Amino acid sequence: MKKSSDKSPVRQHDTATQINSDAVSSSTSFTDSDSTCSFLTPSMEFPDRISFRRIDFSEAAPTGVVLPSTSSELTRSNSSENKIPNEDISVSTSSRYLVFDKILALMKKSPGRRGDKTSPARRLDRSDAVRRNIDYDAGEDSSSLLITRSLDFPNRTSFRVDGVDDGEIDRIYQYIGVSGPEDFAISSDAWKARMEHERSSSDVVNKLKSLDLDSREAGPSGGVVASSSMNHKFQGHDLSEAGSIGVVVASNFTLSESNKIENLNSLRDKEIVDGDMVENRCGIERKPTILVKSRGYLVHNDDVGVGGGIKGVRPPVLNVPRADKEVVDGGTVESKSGIEWKPTILVKSKGYLVSNDGGIKGVTSPVLNLRPTDKEVVDSGTVENRRGIKGVRPSVLKPPPVMKLPPVDLPGSSWDILTHFAPDSEIVRRPSSSSSSENGCDEEEAEDDKVEKEETGDMFIQLEDTTDEACSFTTNEGDSSSTVSNTSPICVSGGSINTSWQKGQLLRQGSFGSVYEAISEDGDFFAVKEVSLLDQGSQAQECIQQLEGEIALLSQLEHQNILRYRGTDKDGSNLYIFLELVTQGSLLELYRRYQIRDSLISLYTKQILDGLKYLHHKGFIHRDIKCATILVDANGTVKLADFGLAKVSKLNDIKSRKETLFWMAPEVINRKDNDGYRSPADIWSLGCTVLEMCTGQIPYSDLEPVEALFRIRRGTLPEVPDTLSLDARHFILKCLKLNPEERPTATELLNHPFVRRPLPSSGSGSTSPLIRR
């Protein structure tokens, strides 16, 4: 900035004054938002004196920076109070330029000057004020004033939660300024109040819609509703003469002059209170057309006189829809909107529905034909519900016949075998399905008694032999079975036990119970098999009835190689099966005591085939061919025992099922229907039995029962030693064909060389087939 070349005092004075004004205007001062801060500003007067005045900056902006925009703050101190007489400073002409230089330096350092690139001066903050012992009294709302507008809205609008740190959610709450998820919750009281408000508003709208608003220019009245001017406040109307209706509706809800309601949805913005002035939510004042009740009529409020009467012609009564009525028998009914109406009520009088006018007057009202909903109509008569029968009593319908279920052969399936390997507590017994049939053994007695008899799937037998015959056999009689005492066994055929008997010593433990020797009163010895009923559970009675019916049929079989059944008896806890007594025991006991040669094995095999041929021809399947179930008498005659009992799975204990597994055919284990137990299954068991007699060991003797089960299922044959004769090996392998259709029948096997070899001669001349050492 150039200095003026003019040396006159007047020009120098004017120049200094202008420079001083610019310097002061570029100076800065600081204020606090909570208190007023003032400072001394130099007021220069040239050429006389330099004085100072105090300037108040209480009107400063919140930013804390005050920039004087005019030079009015620099005033000449001509008055006596602005001068400082004791501190006057004389300014010479030589020192004036020094002052100007200082002012210019100050102007260059000012941060508010344009084009200045120097760093701004340090800002005065509250910490400096405390150091300088300046008293500072912060107000209660000082913290809120310091927050700028930019801090009201966080600059971060999205957050990512990785789930690694446990404090991520807490930091988000802290960032947005809440303490936790509870700050977002709505209190139950506020929610209930809001719901009550919405419910009351919707009820009012429903009531207004139910009225015929088109026939009249208003609805029900009785309160105050504010409407229809945008520029006026609400005005309340006293409608105490309207009665106890309690509802006021404005008809001109739009800003037009028409009194009709053009938009019922505008009612959602109103809150109607009985007898009080109500303001709508939008704050818009409207002038309603109000209807009031006067002597039973709804009329305009302007037509009601001082005494409550109606001016001019009485208007017609509004037609309120029937849907708003609640009809109560014998009294006046109020509609839902609170308006009293006198409906036509029908009451029941002497069986007729008539008008409730205090009785039937004049012409009797027509009777309504109501359908007798409390009656039940039957083809042969009318039955009145819960009031007894009037008229002809209907006939009782005959129940439909019992549905016959297809017979199912459940015992011996692979599932039953697997479950029997489990402990006793884990075994789940299967219920047997049954259907009705008749007993062919005693048809005349069944016809006389007319008792329905049942056929159980467990007792169904399907066979296939040389004649391809198949038949089913009955079991028990349904409800006609009677309890037999110990002294009166069931008589089924000749040779049965008809007198009392006594149990003797134990002979052996059979597959289905213990076998004892017994004697009758006539001195006849026989064997009795004792089966415990306690082991059969809740289905013991059904199981025993099935077994009794089966034994009744087996008792009719007569063959030298078949063990004869002689009847049954039972008491409270046991079932007794009477059998033919065989003293020498089973083949299992025999080959354990003696060494049996091939010739004797061939003889026993021929007798077994004779017995199987007879059973298959009669329609029976043994199901349990093995050495333990084949008995030998004192003459060396082989007898098949325990046949037929294996069909009743309830009588099979766990031990017998494990032992029977080693002789089972693969189709029996893998079967899915009744085709598993057919005559070829007995042929497979016969081959295992011959192998057992030849080796003195049961088949699959080196395997556990479960492992043997899977071996048989996969079709793995038992080991046949090479030490056996060729005929014996060929006979065994012929019986152990995996395909049941490839196995020969019992009749065909009787022609095999293994069973047709000649019998050895006996030195004693005995005709017994048993060869003694």
UniProtKB/Swiss-Prot annotation:
Region spans: Regulatory region: 100-493
Keywords, in A-Z order: ATP-binding, Immunity, Innate immunity, Kinase, Nucleotide-binding, Phosphoprotein, Plant defense, Serine/threonine-protein kinase, Transferase
Residues with PTM Phosphoserine: S79, S150, S365, S768
Induction profile: Down-regulated by MPK4.
Record note on disruption phenotype: No visible phenotype. Suppresses the cell death and defense responses not only in mkk1 mkk2 but also in mekk1 and mpk4 mutants. In the triple mutant mekk1 mekk2 mekk3, no apparent phenotype, but meek1-like dwarf phenotype when complemented by MEKK2. The triple mutant mekk1 mekk2 mekk3 is almost insensitive to external glutamate (L-Glu) on root growth.
Domain Protein kinase: 501-755
One MF term in the entry's GO annotations: ATP binding
Effect of E667K: In summ1-5; suppression of impaired plant defense responses in mkk1 mkk2, mekk1 and mpk4 mutants
Protein name as annotated: Mitogen-activated protein kinase kinase kinase 9
Organism: Arabidopsis thaliana
Gene (UniProt): MEKK2
